[in-house]
Amino acid sequence: MNFITKIDISILNLIQNLKSPLMDKIMTTITAFGNMGIFWILLIIIFLTTKEYKKMAKYMIICLLVNIIIVNLIIKPAVGRQRPFEIVEGIKLLILKPQDPSFPSGHSAISFCMLTTILFFSKSKTINIMASLLAILIAFSRLYLYVHFPSDVFCGIIFGILSSLITLKFCFSKKGISLRKN
């Protein structure tokens, strides 16, 4: 076991001290919001129906697709990292066993990709705070449920933010529009 994996497992085991029946229910529910980006896709659909957020929703779609291609179709298969429950014995999962590789966390990548896009466009403090809290909770739930290493989640967050920023930069630079928020 390498140095990073040892540190990851130590952190995961510390997080396990938070376990309780109530937390189990909360974390399984929160992680379900991130399954296949369902919550974010539903949010995009809702935003598409509004005049104020329609433009943002279109960019959310583009950023989401770029993120899925980079993280789920390229990086995960290329790295092929085992999940923590496959390495540490005696872990009882509270959710269905994920079948794809662990690195990076797709839930974290998609959540922070969507959050970055929302923060770029939205002027609503309520939407920004709610999206921030949800993204953070989804990422944390993956650790609590022992399905990702902390380094998977951290890198997922970084990949999510970068995929959004790079996509927005590319989209806006083609149109000659500055990336700065008005």
Give, region by region, the residue ranges found by the protein language model.
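Alpha-helical architecture
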Residues: 6, 65, 78, 104-105, ...
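Membrane-helix interface segments
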Residues: 22-23, 52-57, 123-129
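Hydrophobic, aromatic-rich transmembrane alpha-helices
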Residues: 40-50, 111-119
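Interfacial segments of alpha-helical transmembrane regions
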Residues: 43-69
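Membrane-embedded catalytic cores of phosphoryl/pyrophosphoryl-handling enzymes
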Residues: 91-182
